[in-house]
Amino acid sequence: MILKLYNTRTRDFSELTNFENVKVYACGPTVYNYAHIGNFRTYVFGDLLIKTLRFLGYKVNYAMNITDIGHLTGDLDDGEDKVAKTAREKGLTVYEISEFFTEAFFNDCRKLNIVYPDKVLVASKHIPIMIEVVKILEEKKITYFSNGNVYFDTSCFKSYGEMAGIDLIDKDMTLPRVDVDKFKRNKTDFVLWFTNSKFKDQEMKWDSPWGFGYPSWHLECAAMNLEYFKDTLDIHLGGVDHIGVHHINEIAIAECFLDNKWCDVFVHGEFLIMDYNKMSKSRGNFITVKDLEDQNFSPLDFRYLCLTSHYRNQLKFSLDNLQASKIARENLINKLSYFYESLDPVDLNTLNKDLKNFGFSVEKEYYDSFVEKISFDLNVAQGLALLWEIIKSENLSFVSKLRLAFIFDEIMSLNLREEILKNLQNHDVVIDENMKALIEERRIAKCEKNFKRADEIRDFFAKKGFVLVDTKEGTKVKRG
């Protein structure tokens, strides 16, 4: 089935008809601190997109950048590089800071079951292409040099700001995250290459035709995209806060460089809201994955919370909401564990084979419904609701419910199979009346020293995948 996504660039839905080589780029972290769960809501959304594409049969080439050079705290040329600022505060080099927080970021991604990109583009390793892009734009007379910095002249790009609804004629409009800069020709102009900034002791600087300096955040992403994906990009991911400045600046750089349209589809995830504000490091109201773990939450509790809301809706975060997600996830695992422990060896064997080899039409109907939901703008929240409907259904066998749950989990990534097995190892198996009778017969046989019969009953349970454990409280049945 073809995936349809809401395209911020066209303000309409776009169908992805190319199945062969879908080029996807996500704006990664600026590695000057731990990423917070507001950031990770966006990365979970990106993960759901990549897994949905692959689930539907698309061949995906997925890249993410690491901004280790940092970007300015504001858009002014006298702002301070975030990575350099943290390095100075901690008495470390910028390389040590960026390496530490890059590793921390991907460790948290693993805990959240976020897929690792096919290519990680580290900004500091791609300086030559950034310089080359600026040189080409300079040759096209799209840049100007002012106060030691190279600026992009947005008046040269007639469609500048269209995605964000910015009107270049309105000179008095207030732009998000853009400060007044007296060295700009136009309010919307932005720096491509800095040689003059407030932080004079910055460690990351490179020689260029314009002097020793470093690239802007916007140039980094655009140039690395152009180098890795060449002349086209299919899908660009990011948060809604990227729309008004960063992504429209990327479009301007790339399309002026190519003299052609660059990226067809831009997809943006909404904020995670805490106390009626978006979560951000600058506001100081952020929570990390480790903070959740310290309060006895699993990172997968947060992932479950993310699954309950569509990516284009703001998601309110509170410990109460997270606790509700924790309880729901544990209930889901407990119900599936009950189904699983009730299976006979034949059904267990079936679950280890082709999951999509449906034996009943009702299974296929539920599967098709799930595919339909995720194919329309990643409606995973409806997919999760469908899973609960399946759990409660009286028209499906236990093996059918488990089969569908495991299929859905290829996208939801809640580790359902692993969590079930872990759950069963820690809990006694629920047994039926026939099993209870056999256990009682074995107890009597042992009392009568009829060890042959006792062993026969033990072996009978073993063939079904169970282990009998004799305790002071009686015989317990566990999975083998």
Swiss-Prot record:
Cofactor note: Binds 1 zinc ion per subunit.
Alphabetical list of CDD domains matching this protein: CysRS_core (cd00672)
Record: residues binding ATP: K281
EC number: 6.1.1.16
Main location per the UniProt record: cytoplasm
Enzyme type, top EC level: ligase
Motif mapping: 'KMSKS' region: 278-282
GO molecular function, one term: cysteine-tRNA ligase activity
One Gene Ontology CC term in the entry: cytosol
Cofactor(s) annotated in UniProt: Zn(2+)
Motif 'HIGH' region in this chain: 29-39
Known catalytic reactions: tRNA(Cys) + L-cysteine + ATP = L-cysteinyl-tRNA(Cys) + AMP + diphosphate
Localization of this protein: Cytoplasm
Record NCBIfam families: cysS (TIGR00435), PRK14534.1 (NF011107)
HAMAP family: Cys_tRNA_synth (MF_00041)
Protein name: Cysteine--tRNA ligase
Classification of source organism: Bacteria, Pseudomonadati, Spirochaetota, Spirochaetia, Spirochaetales
Primary gene name: cysS
